[in-house]
Amino acid sequence: MAKGKRRGQPPKATDQELSVPKVPEDDGHLLLSFRHIQPRFGVDEMSERQRSEFLIKWAKRCGFTWTELGLHTKHGLGYEMLPRSQFKPTPPEALTEDKYMVFRHDANLPFAGFKAGDTFYVLWIETRYGDLYDHGKK
């Protein structure tokens, strides 16, 4: 036998909205996203060691602001900017950047992407030396 009475009150519209904490825009601390990672250059292609080194180095970078990170060397925790034309894979059509940021992970293998706000969007992670760009070019 079914009950005819409803229990409680239906939720109010404001109760259904998710509350997301606001992060100050000028905080300057690093965020990482794999939202735009490209096929053949993702985490699945990395060895266990490479994944570990990637996370360890990124965790160290998170202790700095973007400004502080810019003071580090490119083969340390810092980065360099490389022109779009230097990369072997073609960037997604929607991206119009002329240069991309390149960081290093395991044994100086690079990973590249772009920064929007405080978020770094990874496009490519190199797992074999020379797959992402010719390292002899400048």
Protein language model features and the residues they cover:
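Basic, Lys/Arg-enriched alpha-helical interface segments
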Residues: 1-107, 119-138
